[in-house]
């Protein structure tokens, strides 16, 4: 069976079966980078589920009700919702379920997992899919792990993912999904590092938060930000965050909680640690022969790499990344809170004032010109 691969056994010809995210992690593991305990579900597992559950014909039916390019956004949203609902209604078939359960239990031995997408489409297009598919952290128990694998598979068919694939010219009907299963490393500090600042090639950017990286990635927790000189490997600036919250494991996954007072007054990293993370980014850049965006976490003073991907745009003039609009279809909770505050604190008072001013006008002296 070709449903699961371990990082150290991945070969170059496996790349289109596990996607670039998983393949990149396998290269890092083979080169001695410190990554969490990991397994990869290949696209063969996805296809086995889709075929056994009879979903392929249903997906084609939904996609061909009308020419995709002629669909309005709300029609695409309806189509995507129906397809994803099909994934969630269908159970993983017996042989595949037994195989996955046995492999996951024997390998991870009850550990909580992070379950991440790895879409082979990224290789075909040369475009970044970061943020367009689902990822889950701190998932425990065989049943819940299998449910979340289906959720990752289903996220291949979100409205944002469908629209984005159409925009960059991919054949939506041939899409498939691989999955990364990683032991959840409950880091005390986490973040991302850009080995090359997209807006200034002489700089490195580090963003860091207390707790799990999910808070930063989802936009729920404001990060501290460091700018470093690439050549001199020195810190140029540090912009502190307000440090009010962090994301931590919970019984049902993760949750945002108030940051303890003893942490709120100091940055997640010192200068020495920032330089160490800078070195990690340079190692990743040397391995992949391209500037990298690396997610990392620190647990018990050990630095782990969670994933690494190429930086797709290196200056405003080179911007080809078309994800922004599609990512905006799904706002984070913080985005929605900010929108609510803007409406309640700015827009409504302005509208009320305008209405009051109009009410005080003498309409008899108004002109229609």
Where do the model's predicted regions map?
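Conserved divalent-metal-coordinating catalytic cores
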Residues: 1-31, 37, 43-44, 50, ...
């Amino acid at each position: 069976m070709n449903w699961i691969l371990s990082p150290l056994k991945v070969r170059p010809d496996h790349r289109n079966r596990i996607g670039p995210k998983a393949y990149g992690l396998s290269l890092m593991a083979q080169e001695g980078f410190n990554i969490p305990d990991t397994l990869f579900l290949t696209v063969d597992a996805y296809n086995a589920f889709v075929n056994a559950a009879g979903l392929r014909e249903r997906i084609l039916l939904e996609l061909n009700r009308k020419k995709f390019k002629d669909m309005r956004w709300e029609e695409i949203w309806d189509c995507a919702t129906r397809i994803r609902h099909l994934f969630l209604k269908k159970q993983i078939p017996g042989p595949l379920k037994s195989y996955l359960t046995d492999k996951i239990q024997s390998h991870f031995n009850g550990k909580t997992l992070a379950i991440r997408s790895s879409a082979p489409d990224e290789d075909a297009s040369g475009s970044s899919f970061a943020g367009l598919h689902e990822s889950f952290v701190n998932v425990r128990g065989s049943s819940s792990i299998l449910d979340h694998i289906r959720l990752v598979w289903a996220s291949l068919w979100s409205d944002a993912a469908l629209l984005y694939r159409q925009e960059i010219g991919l054949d939506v009907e041939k899409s498939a999904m691989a999955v990364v299963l990683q032991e959840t490393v409950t880091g005390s500090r986490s973040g991302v590092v850009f080995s090359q600042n997209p807006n200034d090639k002489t700089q490195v950017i580090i963003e860091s938060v207390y707790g799990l990286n999910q808070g930063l990635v989802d936009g729920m927790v404001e990060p501290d930000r460091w700018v470093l000189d690439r050549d001199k490997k020195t810190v140029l600036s540090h912009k502190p965050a307000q440090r009010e919250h962090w994301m931590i494991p919970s019984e049902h996954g993760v949750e945002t909680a108030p940051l303890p007072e003893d942490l709120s007054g100091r940055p997640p990293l010192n200068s020495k640690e920032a330089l160490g993370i800078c070195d990690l980014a340079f190692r990743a850049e040397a391995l992949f022969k391209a500037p990298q965006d690396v997610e990392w976490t620190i647990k018990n003073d050990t630095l782990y790499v969670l994933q690494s991907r190429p930086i797709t745009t290196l200056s405003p003039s080179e911007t080809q990344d078309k994800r922004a609009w599609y990512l905006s279809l799904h706002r984070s909770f913080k985005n929605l809170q900010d929108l609510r505050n803007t409406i309640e604190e700015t827009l409504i008072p302005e509208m009320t004032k305008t209405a009051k001013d109009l009410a005080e006008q003498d309409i008899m002296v108004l002109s229609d010109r």
